[in-house]
Amino acid sequence: EGLVSKQRDGAYPAGRTRAWIKSKCSDRQEFVIAGYVPSSVSKDLVGSLVLGYHEGGKLVYAGRVGTGFSRTVAHDLVARLEPLRRKTPPFAEKPTADAARGVVWVKPELVAEVEFRAWTADGILRHAAFRGLREDKPAREISREAPAAAARPAKPAVRLTHPDRVYWPDV
């Protein structure tokens, strides 16, 4: 889920200190916007976006993103999505009733950049946050990205030592 690091000269006290930092790892990817759910505060604001990606020429449901947009952005998104309204979901497989509840479906023409923590076993985004629209990418080119192959580990930059001996002198 992330990394915990400490300042090099930081102590090891019990409890939390500023010398220790927790950093969460996340992915970032573009998704096609297939619909939206109006905000519970105002129907003129987006509450969440319904996302998908192309696979084998078909649009696949990837989940929703309901955080990361300001009130202004949420209002602007409704203005951009309203002209694209359609009656049916654009996905190859019909979403479940729960996934489709309250959704205003749109033509899959806009692309959102989304930051997220992981994919579930069912292929749904976890802990997604909207980061903006991508005007430079056509929706038809958006597919699920595969992680790059892991690089070979670098040689350690820090020598591990003990006051009385050196560990792994060849490293």
Cite the ranges covered by each PLM segment.
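Catalytic cores of nucleic-acid ligases and guanylyltransferases
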Residues: E1-V171
